[in-house]
Curated annotation (Swiss-Prot):
Its EC number is 7.1.1.-. One of its GO terms (biological process) is electron transport coupled proton transport. This is NADH-quinone oxidoreductase subunit B. It comes from Legionella pneumophila subsp. pneumophila (strain Philadelphia 1 / ATCC 33152 / DSM 7513). It catalyses: a quinone + NADH + 5 H(+)(in) = a quinol + NAD(+) + 4 H(+)(out). NDH-1 is composed of 14 different subunits. Subunits NuoB, C, D, E, F, and G constitute the peripheral sector of the complex. NDH-1 shuttles electrons from NADH, via FMN and iron-sulfur (Fe-S) centers, to quinones in the respiratory chain. Couples the redox reaction to proton translocation (for every two electrons transferred, four hydrogen ions are translocated across the cytoplasmic membrane), and thus conserves the redox energy in a proton gradient. Keywords: 4Fe-4S, Cell inner membrane, Cell membrane, Iron, Iron-sulfur, Membrane, Metal-binding, NAD, Quinone, Translocase, Transport, Ubiquinone. Belongs to the complex I 20 kDa subunit family. PROSITE patterns: COMPLEX1_20K. Binds 1 [4Fe-4S] cluster. [4Fe-4S] cluster binds at C37, C38, C102, C132. One of its GO terms (molecular function) is NADH dehydrogenase (ubiquinone) activity.
Length: 158
């Protein structure tokens, strides 16, 4: 049966890459790692006004149930091993969103002896959301950018 005949009968044709990318990007389960004021904006995104549920995004309390970590706030040296431990407990494939100036590069506390100058020194970061604190719209835009990145990523990497 030719492709044109299948499409006329109502079948949708796609590749496995596109199907898996669509499924992964449409059911992201983030885990919050809120450390400071950025976490309040992260809570706004989960509330009724922005409603992440419509994107298939449901916050999970456990790293073993989540595939996205949102790091929001100042990461200090004492908290860095805990961040790495939680990241290692997440199943593959996993992604990280760095939210706010403090998580991106230390922010206001950049020159403090006890602050990690960016969570990307501890875990690999996929999307950076700028701002101090970033708005809920900025985080939502960052999540949509992560969804686009997941859709473009090949399923079987060598």
């Amino acid at each position: 049966m030719a492709v044109a005949e299948l499409e006329k009968k109502g079948f949708e044709l796609t590749t496995v890459e596109k199907l898996v990318g669509w499924a992964r990007s449409g059911s992201m389960w983030p885990m919050t790692f809120g450390l400071a004021c950025c976490a309040v904006e992260m809570m706004h995104v989960g509330a009724a006004r922005y409603d992440l549920d419509r994107f298939g995004i449901i916050f999970r309390p456990s790293p073993r149930q989540s595939d996205v970590m949102i790091v929001a706030g100042t990461l200090c040296n004492k908290m860095a091993p805990a961040l790495r431990k939680v990241y290692d407990q997440m199943p593959e494939p996993r992604w990280v969103i760095s939210m706010g100036s403090c998580a991106n590069g230390g922010g206001y506390y950049h020159y403090s002896y006890s602050v990690v100058r960016g969570c990307d020194r501890i875990v690999p970061v996929d999307v950076y959301v700028p701002g101090c604190p970033p708005t809920a719209e900025a985080l939502l835009y960052g999540i949509i950018q992560l969804q686009n990145k997941i859709r473009r990523k090949p399923v079987l990497e060598a």
